[in-house]
Amino acid sequence: MSESYAKIARDGLWDKNIVTGQMLALCPTLAITGTATNGLGMGLATTVVLILSNVVISALRKTIAPEIRIPAFILIIAAIVTVVDLALNAWLHDLHKVLGLFIALIVTNCAILGRAEAFASRFGVLASALDGLMMGIGFTLALVVVGAIREILGSGTLFAQASLLLGPHFAFMELQIFPDYPGFLIMILPPGGFLVVGGLFALKRIIDARKPTIEQEIKQMRTERVFTAAGVLKPKLETGEEA
């Protein structure tokens, strides 16, 4: 069971990351990540929707007829998004004004409907909640990384206006990375989003291509340690020769 939960976490955070792994939700990723603060706010809102929709759909999976499951999933997701939208408007009004229409457009996010269809409709509530949480955290991390890179290169700040958008308790996050920075306009415009997201895609592919080699080296080192402890192999000196 712990291994399956670990796989759910690994899929959400890395292997099937909504942005870098599945290349979904690119519209909000490119549009609202001009700052890390906006990315964090959008990511947290999407995480709440993912968790709640997965839990509700998993709990109702045996009562929803297969023929109408997609419309039913969309209605459930739309209801949850409406609640989140109203909550943001009530308690984080400044952030709601910045994110604007993209909160309502969470309903059309393919990743949320995809997790409902591929996971929540087939597995239990606990596993579905974990899947929603991990997918949401992975999505939030991707948005924050994209937003941070664009904000640092574009305006020389990090988490600017966090206290205004997220509340006064987040004032400690506001950083001025480059004082008197003239700015790099293209990075806070949509073309900058394409450049940063494309770079993250390439970086993930490079890391994934190296993973089999790294895992093989780790496995070989563990095997050698076992055999050395058992006396089958002699320990090696620093020069690489056997003692």
Curated annotation (Swiss-Prot):
It is found in: Cellular chromatophore membrane. One of its GO terms (biological process) is nitrogen fixation. Its EC number is 7.-.-.-. It is a multi-pass membrane protein. Induction: Expression is reduced under iron-limiting conditions. It is an enzyme of class 7 (translocase). The keyword Transport applies. It comes from the Bacteria. The keyword Electron transport applies. Belongs to the NqrDE/RnfAE family. The complex is composed of six subunits: RnfA, RnfB, RnfC, RnfD, RnfE and RnfG. Part of a membrane-bound complex that couples electron transfer with translocation of ions across the membrane. Required for nitrogen fixation. Involved in electron transfer to nitrogenase. This is Ion-translocating oxidoreductase complex subunit E. It comes from Rhodobacter capsulatus (Rhodopseudomonas capsulata).
